Amino acid sequence: LTQRYGGGTFGTVYIHRVLYALSSGTSHSAQFALAAMFKTAADGTFDFISEVKEYGRRAERLKKIFTDYGFRIVYDHDLDEPIADGFYFTIAYPGMTGGELMEELIYYGVCAISLSTTGSNQEGLLACTSFIKPHQYALLEERLKLFKENHTA
């Protein structure tokens, strides 16, 4: 956190960088709603962890599918710590820039955001776990199998 944001602790970065960026210019009612959610989480009356675990399960399954078909995970560590599975993860394919990969995957019905649009210097894509449904994993595997067959030298 110190290298990336100039702050040393999670709390400092979270309050002064993340929360400020998310809530500055936001209406009072939205800020109060967010504060209420944080309060219930802190009080233990809202188990937010169980609410977000599904994204981790999806990411774990999606990462396996992508890596089984020749992709690699771009960001798998933050400094020396492994990155947990969650809402987003990053992928790359050998010999392709993020833009090339994004364009090519569209032909296979797979969409993601190029890492270059997020300010990253790494080549690859940012994939989101939020919209995939259980019945779509097999379809994704079929599409990535075709992708690999068509992109293997």
Regions found by a protein language model. Name each.
Residues 26, 47, 54-58, 97, ...:
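Soluble or luminal CAZymes and related metallo-dependent hydrolases
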Residues 28, 103-112, 116-153:
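PLP-dependent enzyme catalytic core of the Aspartate aminotransferase-like
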Residues 35-38, 63, 90, 102, ...:
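Non-transmembrane alpha-helical segments in soluble domains
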Residues 48-63, 73-92, 118:
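Conserved glycine-rich beta-strand-loop-beta hairpin in the small C-terminal domain of fold type I
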Residues 91-95, 129-131:
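Short beta-strand-to-loop capping motifs
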